[in-house]
Amino acid sequence: MKVLILIMIIASLMIMGVEMDRDSCVDKSRCAKYGYYQECQDCCKNAGHNGGTCMFFKCKCA
């Protein structure tokens, strides 16, 4: 039982790490209301993601 709980804790920490990496461009590139979406795409691709979009003036990597 303790092993199962330990595995679940480790898995949740790994998932949290992936989510944090996915948003690695949020602080680097704030999106303007109009345009500048290419900067977000480039930032996410340089960080190793497939691309990104602007949501609520923040860059979200996919």
Swiss-Prot record:
Keywords for this protein: Disulfide bond, Ion channel impairing toxin, Knottin, Neurotoxin, Potassium channel impairing toxin, Secreted, Signal, Toxin, Voltage-gated potassium channel impairing toxin
Q: For the site Key residue on the interacting surface with the channel, which positions are given? A: M55
Identify the residue position(s) of the site May represent the binding site.
Answer: K33
Q: Where in the cell is it found?
A: Secreted
Gene Ontology CC annotation, any one: extracellular region
Q: What is the effect of changing M55A?
A: 30-fold reduction in affinity for Kv11.1/KCNH2/ERG1 potassium channel (Kd=303.4 nM)
Q: In which tissues is it expressed?
A: Expressed by the venom gland.
The record's function comment reads: Blocks human and rat Kv11.1/KCNH2/ERG1 and Kv11.3/KCNH7/ERG3, as well as rat (but not human) Kv11.2/KCNH6/ERG2 by binding to channel outer vestibule (S5P domain) with a 1:1 stoichiometry. Inhibition data are the following: hERG1 (reversible, IC(50)~7 nM), rERG1 (reversible, Kd=6.8 nM), rERG2 (irreversible, Kd=2.8 nM), hERG3 (irreversible, Kd=4.05 nM) and rERG3 (reversible, Kd=38.1 nM) potassium channels. The toxin potency is not affected by elevating potassium ion concentration from 2 to 98 mM. This toxin only blocks channels in a closed state.
Q: What else is known?
A: The affinity of the toxin for the channel decreases as temperature increases (Kd=7.3 nM and Kd=64 nM at 22 and 37 degrees Celsius, respectively), likely due to changes in the structure of the channel binding site. Negative results: does not affect the function of either mouse EAG/KCNH1 or ELK1 channels at concentration of 200 nM. Does not inhibit hKv1.4/KCNA4, hKv4.3/KCND3, hKv2.1/KCNB1 and rKv7.1/KCNQ1 potassium channels at concentration of 50 nM. Does not inhibit human Kv11.2/KCNH6/ERG2.
> What domain comment accompanies this record?
The presence of a 'disulfide through disulfide knot' structurally defines this protein as a knottin.
Q: State the name under which the record lists this protein.
A: Potassium channel toxin gamma-KTx 1.1
